[in-house]
Amino acid sequence: MNRIQQTFQTSSAPFWYAQLELGFCYENSRTIMSHRKHYGPVRVQKMLWPEKTGVCHAIIVHPPAGIAGGDHLTFQIETEGQAHAVITTPGAGKWYRTNGKQAFQHIYLNVKDDSILEWMPQETMLFDGALAHSETDIHLEQTASFIGWDMLVLGRQARAENFVQGSYHNQFKLWRKNKLLVADTLYFEGGDRWLSSCLGMNNQAVMASFWAVPPEKFRSSFYLEQHIELIRELIMRMDVPVTLTLLEDVLCARFLGNDVRRCHDAFAAIRAKLRRYWFDLDEEFPRIWKT
């Protein structure tokens, strides 16, 4: 029997504490949401099944549309055997200018054997004056597969805003069976020389990372080297500032530039190729991206 729980509480505190737990399993030839629990202003807006294979597309929404000083936002998501979930957001996330308090986001993803999770939130904007702390922990079992990304935009580009005050701290860890495969840590403060240095952001406003872990049968160097060369050819044709590397059997792409739409298009194209190579699936972009 499916277990779906929902809770909602409000608080008079001048900050938000919000948490969303989601669980996905495979039942009756499609992926379903078997567990849902939320606290505060974060929830699933919609679930769709646009693919013939029964992949579940879920849209998660945080009604305040951003994280302010003192806020804590937590996501806990799990996929079970044979489930395939695609998770995205309806629009850009935001780290707002702070009131002097730190803001936090925690993301915990648990991908069990034979399941697939695609974690594809839209970009996050870092407002000048934000104090942002973000942590992402991804745990894969041996035969689990994962595709995900993180896109950060410094300042509000429409206002030509730069990040001159505040700080940003991001920690990303990807594990498989308690073995650490990837560990990324980034910290900078507003106005840091690193933001303008050619060894850092080089005066660019958009920085993004893409990670992908294939099914077990495609983890040999024979397959991975073929696939990464095909993706390099794609990136060259698109003429976008993306670099590709392999960290053991994790494919990693990095974007550094000024146009977040070009970043999104590049990562979406890489994701589409990997879906075809690894899962024999069409690209099937989330419909919310077209609105």
Curated annotation (Swiss-Prot):
Annotated InterPro entries: UreD
GO CC terms of this entry: cytoplasm
Pfam family, one: UreD
Molecular function GO terms recorded: nickel cation binding
Keywords associated with the record: Chaperone, Cytoplasm, Nickel insertion
Coiled-coil stretches noted in the UniProt entry, renumbered to this chain: none
Source organism superkingdom: Bacteria
Compartmental location: Cytoplasm
Family: Belongs to the UreD family.
PANTHER family, A to Z: UREASE ACCESSORY PROTEIN D (PTHR33643:SF1)
Subunit structure: UreD, UreF and UreG form a complex that acts as a GTP-hydrolysis-dependent molecular chaperone, activating the urease apoprotein by helping to assemble the nickel containing metallocenter of UreC. The UreE protein probably delivers the nickel.
Function description: Required for maturation of urease via the functional incorporation of the urease nickel metallocenter.
Protein name per Swiss-Prot or TrEMBL: Urease accessory protein UreD
Organism of origin: Acinetobacter baumannii (strain ATCC 17978 / DSM 105126 / CIP 53.77 / LMG 1025 / NCDC KC755 / 5377)
